[in-house]
Amino acid sequence: MVPGEENQLVPKEDVFWRCRQNIFDEMKKKFLQIENAAEEPRVLCIIQDTTNSKTVSERITLNLPASTPVRKLFEDVANKVGYINGTFDLTRENGVTTADMAPLDHTSDKSLLDANFEPGKKNFLHLTDKDGEPPQMLLEDSNNVDDSVHDRFIGPLPREGSVASTNDYVSQNYSYSSILNKSETGYVGLVNQAMTCYLNSLLQTLFMTPEFRNALYKWEFEDSEEDPVTSIPYQLQRLFVLLQTSKKRAIETTDVTRSFGWDSSEAWQQHDVQELCRVMFDALEQKWKQTEQADLINELYQGKLKDYVRCLECGYEGWRIDTYLDIPLVIRPYGSSQAFASVEEALHAFIQPEILDGPNQYFCERCKKKCDARKGLRFLHFPYLLTLQLKRFDFDYTTMHRIKLNDRMSFPEELDMSTFIDIEDEKSPQTESCTDSGAENEGSCHSDQMSNDFSTDDAVDEGICLESSSGSEKISKPGLEKNSLMYELFSVMVHSGSAAGGHYYACIKSFSDDQWYSFNDQHVSRITQEDIKKTHGGSSGSRGYYSSAFASSTNAYMLIYRLKDPTRNAKFLEVDEYPEHIKNLVQKERELEEQEKRQREIERNTCKIKLFCLHPVKQVMMENKLEVHKDKTLKEAVEMAYKMMDLEDVIPLDCCRLVKYDEFHDYLERSYEGEEDTPMGLLLGGVKSTYMFDLLLETRKPDQIFQSYKPGEVMVKVHVVDLKAETVAAPVTVRAYLNQTVTEFKQLISKATHLPADSMRIVLERCYNDLRLLSMPSKTLKAEGFFRSNKVFVESSETVDHQAAFTDSHLWKLLDRHANTIRLFVLLPEQSPGSYSKRTAYQKAGGDSGNVDDDCERVKGPAGNLKSVDAILEESTEKLKSLSLQQQQQDGDNGDSSKSTETSDFENIESPLNERGSSTSVDNRELEQHIQTSDPENFQSEERSDSDVNNDRSTSSVDSDILSSSHSSDTLCNADSAQIPLANGLDSHSITSSRRTKANEGKKETWDTAEEDSGTDSEYDESGKSRGDMQYMYFKADPYTADEGSGEGHKWLMVHVDKRITLAAFKQHLEPFVGVLSSHFKVFRVYTSNQEFETVRLNETLSSFSDDNKITIRLGRALKKGEYRVKVCQLLVNEQEPCKFLLDAVFAKGMTVRQSKEELIPQLREQCGLDLSIDRFRLRKKTWKNPGTVFLDYHIYEEDINISSNWEVFLEVLDGVEKMKSMSQLAILTRRWRPAEMKLDPFQELVLESNSVDELREKLSEISGIPLEDIEFAKGRGTFPCDISVLDIHQDLDWNPKVSTLNVWPLYICDDGAVIFYRDRTEEVMELTDEQRNELMKKESSRLQKTGHRVTYSPRKEKALKIYLDGAPNKDVAQD
């Protein structure tokens, strides 16, 4: 034997033991290597491909031994992603940016450990372009990897990305390149828009038909005659040219469908390929009129058959000639459990005659009597392209389901049709036979119809918006030889799925190479005869007859054969044989494709990143998207951003620069000094679809210089606090390092703010309302909780406040107020003449509450006779405070007055608007009535619906420069001048002084379960005293002029308020500005969509409000406990709009229906102009638009009638005395249908004593005069008034249900308000001409659209497939 190398084991004679020892030694060495490899640290590499936007979201993960050479890393990555090694770069990510990192050397033998990779940690790398050139694909030209997956797959392919995910993204790379690269088969696929697979399979079949494609190429489009967008033949020409010349794997069909007049929604409609075939051929015939291709469809696809009836007694035969475009073949005969085995068997069954006997006898014109006869079909002429439809869809009348028949039906590759043609009939048709009028032009036996498919009625029925007429058909030559009827199969359209839906694709034989291909949307692959046999149908194992209702299977649905005739069989036109206009079209499409390719390349190398800029003048943050080529330098990118933000006339270009920015944290990460000539692709770390950071176009003043931002720095916004003025200044930005101490940080702030560092206090706001005093000088900022972006408050006043505990200090209280203050814009009620009387009533309602505390410092208003808003507010709140103290003294036993929570009685508060010394008062009831009736317009303009609490809980604090208590509008003045003035005027015991106190206050935001029964919180307790929160927090109001203007008489307030205040207290503060008590106005919150919702829960805080929210104040009495605001609408049963809003009323628990009607009468008279007596109208339940239970006068709310917030009720005016006396009665709305006149009578109400159908029939007979036995009725469908087209009502409703009572299926009439249609069964339906029908359809459509009802009621009605010849859907309802 030949001696081996050192690592080979070569056995020698008589050395068995030595050989065995060598084997053991070798195995031991291998085990040691494995053991060492297991112990060796490993490096986890995570690679992101940034070379294009499609793969940027993918990650490649490699876990390699630390000793692996760098070159091996490149090889592994290249194998993973399918790139050629050496055509891409790998760049390390250092945690901040990849811009400063040099690419790794793909030839280096240095180990990963020596290349500074960290074992045991994640090492992130970016795969980038090499020298500006994109990586080269290993299989870019052939795409063998792609096609290997689908090469033999002819069924529906899985959606891209649905394959189980691995860390390699080869499949993902395929999904991108598959659109750009042509299949190895040489054929181009079609993109499925959504559910257009049926369209794709037909288009590919037509494209692979030489006769059709060549004829289409010969047709020339005339620009002057038609718009190319709406020309179906021209768009098919373009599509075929692209299918023949494009280098893409798949092309779009949107231009073709647009020429059909389809919008994007049509792509989501499932249709039948056979239906599309006929509709498309009809449309092409119309477009090709008066051209060489006018008769193309008939020449290629149209055949003839004879429909005959032969008398068996005298032999007389009546017949007519029908044309067809396809032959529908039954899979399984009706009533049989056995399917036809083959297409030939089904064809024989198709022409098998049937005997007409018994009751189906035929009336013979010659015998002049009914005789037995034979009825059948005979083929007279077969088309050049024979289309066979296999009728796999059927309806199962047992289960009432549509089913698919998956039975096996074989079909041959070559089909001899000579046995099915009746040559004798074609040679010499019987002279005595009778031809029906119009038989020559009556159409085809297409689909399920054997005639009249091209008739006008059919065109409307199938939705083809054209008047079709078949041209004269050439009669087949007599003496046709049988051997010339051999057909060759070349297209099989396959349906995969069930009767509920599925997928179409086509298996097509190419006449160029005689190979079969699967055209499955964008995927084209080569298949074999074995794959074709799989489409014959059938399944392994036994399957019941009805199991196919929901079964999914793949089988042939449509077959297309071509006649084997060497004299007629055409070949595809070669390029040099193209007509001149097709050559021009090819060149034009190539140029467009090249342009698209260049554009894709540009997109592939374009960095798209968010760009922000703080406008130097407006001080508004602007946002845009910067799209810059990766090779553009930073300097060029700055110029692009400068122009994009429209700063040319605002600031010089040299005062702008781009910096790395984190918009979420408002953090400037780094600046790019000295990198003005660096490409943006390198700065941004490659081309990506999304970036983890943004860019900021930073600006400066001409006399300033840019600050350098380095990675690792943190940004701090410093707010200077002035304790004396109680102000918080706008922020100053300071950059620091996390390893700096608090002492060093103070020195840094001192330089920026010029405050002394020795007495400086720094408070860090780590999150909302979380304040932390930095009291440890030696602690680092990182230890104190600093992050990328931070917010601190500093102050350096040398006061005794330094000695107090932080949570008890003045600084903490000021910052706490600052954090919880929001700005609201309040729209006050219109200052109309009616408002003056309301204010007067408010003034009279108050009593003298005593003099204002003389120790309070009064705020002086502006010069003039009128007091300022601030002065009014100051005076009002002083009176409220004084009254509160008086109340506390009266109660006496409530404990410490500083902790008192007793609320004041607002009925005794004197308004600051009152005249001094006025003591006149009015009764509360009179006051309420006066407010409600003095200005009805205010009530008409009120919001139509109230609402429960709005649950959004945003917690936004006001900007630091907004708040300043140095203004003159603080709510309460200081009771003790020696105390440090606080924001709300109370001493330090009255404000929250710890987080625990705030937490307890937060409980006020929960629902008040004690008031749930009334649907809202009452402003008054059972004793009538106010429940408003007396802990007055910060409130400041200033006059405000809205930009958009609110109209004359309206007034705005800009209110700064502590959002922990309750709604009750907030309303109390607004009393002086509204001019009425808080119980007589309502607060509506205005949302961004200008919708208004009433805020009603008085014990809740304003924490759900945020900065700059708008509030509208409307006059109207607030609800008390047990009261509900009810929306009253008028029911007008015979009006076009049966529901009309009248007014908002207040109903109370325990009130009877009659009492509520008594209260409604004066309101209806004054506000709606309705003068009604109490017995001439009723109230009834309203459920959306439907009238319901009739409420009787003695019914009691909350006992007999459940009532809730946002309740609605119908008010119905009666023509006579109320007939409803008892709940056992049933009120039904009836309407007579008159078919002879095609109209509906007005509604009439019937009151039944029981739910008996017999009683209903009797009552209907009484009011209509129709005999009892001729009454037919049906329940209306949908919402009131149950409108339905008069064209559909006679057939669509379920007339005369077989029931004896109304409360059972299918009626289920158990409550008042049901709609019943009735008719006289002896009355015939009016016969309409087409013109009358179309006119009536238009009128009905217009009527029903106005009432919001559909023209027809048809559940799950399939939408007809249409092709619009004018390029857009016809709005004429008649075409629907």
From Swiss-Prot:
GO cellular component: cytoplasm; nucleus; SCF ubiquitin ligase complex
Modified residues (Phosphoserine): 832, 911, 934, 1014, 1018
Modified residues (Phosphothreonine): 1016
One example GO MF annotation: WD40-repeat domain binding
Compositionally biased spans, kind Low complexity: 882-900, 954-970
Compartment annotation: Cytoplasm
Alphabetized CDD domains for the sequence: peptidase_C19C
Annotated positions of the N6-acetyllysine modification: 122
Pfam annotation, one family: UCH
Residues at the active site: 197 (nucleophile), 503 (proton acceptor)
Compositionally biased intervals (Polar residues): 430-452, 930-939
Protein name: Ubiquitin carboxyl-terminal hydrolase 47
Catalytic function, reaction form: Thiol-dependent hydrolysis of ester, thioester, amide, peptide and isopeptide bonds formed by the C-terminal Gly of ubiquitin (a 76-residue protein attached to proteins as an intracellular targeting signal)
Known function: Ubiquitin-specific protease that specifically deubiquitinates monoubiquitinated DNA polymerase beta (POLB), stabilizing POLB thereby playing a role in base-excision repair (BER). Acts as a regulator of cell growth and genome integrity. May also indirectly regulate CDC25A expression at a transcriptional level.
Family, similarity comment: Belongs to the peptidase C19 family. USP47 subfamily.
Summary of subunit composition and partner proteins: Interacts with BTRC and FBXW11. Interacts with POLB.
Domain USP: 188-564
Chain spans, region Disordered: 426-452, 835-863, 880-971, 985-1025
Source taxon at top rank: Eukaryota
Species of the source: Mus musculus (Mouse)
Swiss-Prot/TrEMBL keywords: Acetylation, Cytoplasm, DNA damage, DNA repair, Hydrolase, Phosphoprotein, Protease, Thiol protease, Ubl conjugation pathway
